[in-house]
Swiss-Prot record:
It comes from Methylococcus capsulatus (strain ATCC 33009 / NCIMB 11132 / Bath). Residues 128-269 form the FAD-binding FR-type domain. Binds 1 [2Fe-2S] cluster. HAMAP family: NqrF. This is Na(+)-translocating NADH-quinone reductase subunit F. Its main location: membrane.
């Protein structure tokens, strides 16, 4: 019995000693406490060692754009690290060239704060704010697209430029597609593909970016066009649906939603050149924002055309609004193209893919398509097809502006 007691005693003593050794080593090898991060040579923040730079900035109300929520894939959270950032990581090299890296460009979501740092961020970051908004409405405008309207707190406004975007946050959640409020006229395909059985289970907070559909004079609100991201056909049990789009589709009037912004690069140039807008799907959002801003706020007299592609009339939205703008503004024309019109549509307008319609019905006989400015947002295949068509007819790449968010 004595031997057993002694054995237990010595074993416990050894374990306790090892714990103290490990804790002592940790105190020597692992830095703790806070360090200073100097931003733009003006503002200093105190940051816990081990934080990601993106998170540290957000904790100090400096919201750097990050459409992927810090996953290192969107490359929007770029900052310049002038001192203290360590070596650039392999995860950053696919987004940052050697020349840019030599200038200190880094992805803030990939930079771990280990020592005092000096960084430079875009001035617009200092104007980015965060709000808790209230859902005013969340209606379908197409089979798989919602128009989400958020009300800002009383007296608040997002000071944005047309073509800008916000980031929306979602907490961990569980939802069933069967709980979505889908209007009766849009349920046919949901029934056909039995989408009601899909569920979304999200265990960690997420952030995504969405272009705004409202324009700056529509104050006090944020309007988004959001397409639901469903799993590939036959993969419903193994591939999850879109994290943020499922969350948004499940929102009801009165729900609270946290957003931050404004951000943006997809802005109209201040020239007299003709503007050609091309959109499809949820890419309608920045198109609406730009066109409304040009015609209603700026009273622009620039020549403008808008080419929007949809499958059928059911998938086309804001038709009455654009019809009214066209009637009231002689410098603006808009054209709808349907790729798969339904018999009940009685469609006599343009049919086919929008890049072909744009070329055959307009640019083919345009006296100088290379002198126009092109603004586009839509599904990836549409974007690629339009860009290639424009390059083929001699348009410089610098005159092709693309918003990758809205599709």
């Amino acid at each position: 019995m004595l031997e057993i007691i002694l054995g237990v005693f010595f074993f416990t003593a050894i374990v306790v000693a090892l714990v103290f050794v490990i804790l002592g080593a940790k105190s020597k090898l692992v830095a703790e406490g806070n360090v200073e991060v100097l931003i733009n040579g003006e503002r200093t923040i105190h940051v816990p060692i081990g934080s990601k730079l993106l998170t540290a900035l957000a904790d100090n109300n400096l919201f750097v754009s990050s459409a992927c929520g810090g996953g290192g894939t969107c490359a929007q959270c770029r900052v310049q690290v002038l001192e203290g950032g360590g070596e650039i990581l392999p995860t950053e090299l696919s987004h940052i060239t050697k020349r840019e890296a030599a200038q200190g460009d880094r992805l803030s979501c990939q930079v771990t704060v280990k020592q005092n740092m000096k960084i430079h961020v875009h001035e617009e970051v200092f104007g980015v704010k965060k709000w808790e908004c209230t859902v005013r409405s969340n209606r379908n405008v197409a089979t798989f697209i919602k128009e989400l309207v958020l009300e800002l707190p009383a007296g608040e406004n997002v000071d944005f430029r047309a073509g800008g975007y916000i980031q929306i946050e979602c907490p961990p959640y569980d939802c069933k597609f069967s709980d979505f409020a889908i209007e009766p006229e849009y349920r046919e395909d949901w029934d056909k593909y039995d989408l009601w059985k899909i569920e979304s289970h999200v265990k960690a907070p997420a952030i995504r970016a969405y272009s705004m559909a409202n324009y700056p004079e529509e104050k006090g609100i944020i309007m988004l066009n959001v397409r639901i991201a469903t799993p590939p056909w036959g993969k419903e049990g193994t591939v999850p649906p879109g994290v943020m789009s499922s969350y948004i589709f499940n929102l009801k009037p009165g729900d609270k939603v946290t957003i931050s912004g404004p951000f943006g690069e997809f802005f109209a140039r201040d020239t007299d050149k003709e503007m050609v807008f091309i959109g499809g799907g949820a890419g309608m959002a920045p198109m609406r924002s730009h066109i409304f801003d040009q015609l209603l706020r700026l009273k622009s007299k620039r020549k403008m055309t808008f080419w929007y592609g949809a499958r059928s009339l059911r998938e086309a939205f804001y038709v009455e609004e654009f019809d009214r703008l066209q009637a009231e503004n002689p410098n603006f024309k808009w054209f709808l193209g349907l790729s798969d019109p339904k018999p009940e549509d009685g469609w006599t307008g343009y049919t086919g893919f929008i890049h072909n319609i744009l070329y055959e019905q307009y640019l083919k006989n345009h006296p100088a398509p290379e002198d126009c400015e092109y603004y586009m947002c839509g599904p990836p295949m549409m974007n690629s097809a339009v860009i290639q068509m424009l390059l083929d007819i001699g348009v410089d790449r610098e005159n092709i502006m693309l918003d990758d968010f809205g599709g």
